[in-house]
């Protein structure tokens, strides 16, 4: 079916009182992303010509958080119902486009379901997303005659007979722009809440002899809204369970799917193994045969084939070539790069530093603003002193260098190829190739030394 051009309206003006937060409800995150951003992404993926965001509470915070240039910001100064919210956006509707109505606190709506709704919308009519619930208390009921949708009755306005209806309105619908504007202009607030309900346009359409087609989502979670943190946490687990299932079916071994969080996009090779309590954030790529230990956090990084990341390691904005080993308890900060076969051990931190092929930093080391060659050994307790209190400086270490334990390299400094730095040395000047650098206080020894004793 050929679809008309389409724009999307996202209602996001609610305060979210039950969240007990200074943050607008729709900015609370699910899978590391604001709820409303999930909805915006779905609208854009669906091909929306325009996305109209109706906002009210916390507008400044919303504008700081949402940088999408495709957004048209529509202010709703008073929250007088869903129909009133749509009336604020109506001046922006084109007559010949379809208008899809979504909600900023319904984050798991899928593009597939929305496309089915869009395809099902009859010419001149309304496409409506509905579900059947065992307990529909509190929801607007779908009324029908001879199987055809005739209207929606809000729970507070429903008769006892209507409250027995199990099919309920999700609030998501699509209609033609010209029709939508005409129906919105006819809305009244003659109801128990004193609000303008968008749902009243269903009865208006029926009275005009327009067809209303109901479509059901693939999963109930797609249309579940969030009003409190408990509901948000439940949807988080639903989402994470779905992502884990997809990864398992695609060949990723998750040791415990219930203890894995994906807060972004994961691209992976074959035979990847991920232990418990691992968090993946942003855009992460894992090569073939990558192993990730328990408690690791990987963010916006590329991990090459055959790498092994031991438990409780944090990797952010880093790039690892093949066969690298990291951790446990290592931290790779933005700009860290490991070439093939490099090793970073426990309690080692790297930032804006490159570790060459086969090079090793095994223990208790800080490497910042550094360029380290191939086959270099960095001894325990080594520190690149890259900051003088005002500016950062670089340390360069050539190939085949041996750096002894407890060494401080005061940048800017260069250590030539094949050099050796003796343990306990503070390097303040460049070291030549194949040279030995040593800066220790000469050792003295006092024979027969007696330790002090406590005075009584």
Swiss-Prot record:
Its cofactor is Mg(2+). It comes from the Bacteria. Its main location: cytoplasm. InterPro entries: Bifunctional_GlmU, GlmU-like, GlmU_C_LbH, Hexapep, Hexapep_transf_CS, MobA-like_NTP_Trfase, Nucleotide-diphossugar_trans, Trimer_LpxA-like_sf. Keywords: Acyltransferase, Cell shape, Cell wall biogenesis/degradation, Cytoplasm, Magnesium, Metal-binding, Multifunctional enzyme, Nucleotidyltransferase, Peptidoglycan synthesis, Repeat, Transferase. The keyword Repeat applies. SUPFAM superfamilies: Nucleotide-diphospho-sugar transferases (SSF53448), Trimeric LpxA-like enzymes (SSF51161). Its EC number is 2.7.7.23, 2.3.1.157. Residues 230-250 are annotated as: Linker. PROSITE patterns: HEXAPEP_TRANSFERASES. Residues 251-456 are annotated as: N-acetyltransferase. Pathway: Nucleotide-sugar biosynthesis; UDP-N-acetyl-alpha-D-glucosamine biosynthesis; N-acetyl-alpha-D-glucosamine 1-phosphate from alpha-D-glucosamine 6-phosphate (route II): step 2/2; Nucleotide-sugar biosynthesis; UDP-N-acetyl-alpha-D-glucosamine biosynthesis; UDP-N-acetyl-alpha-D-glucosamine from N-acetyl-alpha-D-glucosamine 1-phosphate: step 1/1; Bacterial outer membrane biogenesis; LPS lipid A biosynthesis. Acetyl-CoA binds at residues 380, 386-387, 405, 423, 440. Mg(2+) binds at residues 105, 227. It is found in: Cytoplasm. UDP-N-acetyl-alpha-D-glucosamine binds at residues 11-14, 25, 76, 81-82, 103-105, 140, 154, 169, 227, 333, 351, 366, 377. One of its GO terms (cellular component) is cytoplasm. Residues 1-229 are annotated as: Pyrophosphorylase. The keyword Cell wall biogenesis/degradation applies. GO terms for molecular function: glucosamine-1-phosphate N-acetyltransferase activity; magnesium ion binding; UDP-N-acetylglucosamine diphosphorylase activity. Binds 1 Mg(2+) ion per subunit. Homotrimer. NCBIfam families: glmU, PRK09451.1. In the N-terminal section; belongs to the N-acetylglucosamine-1-phosphate uridyltransferase family. This is Bifunctional protein GlmU. It comes from Escherichia coli O1:K1 / APEC. The gene is glmU.
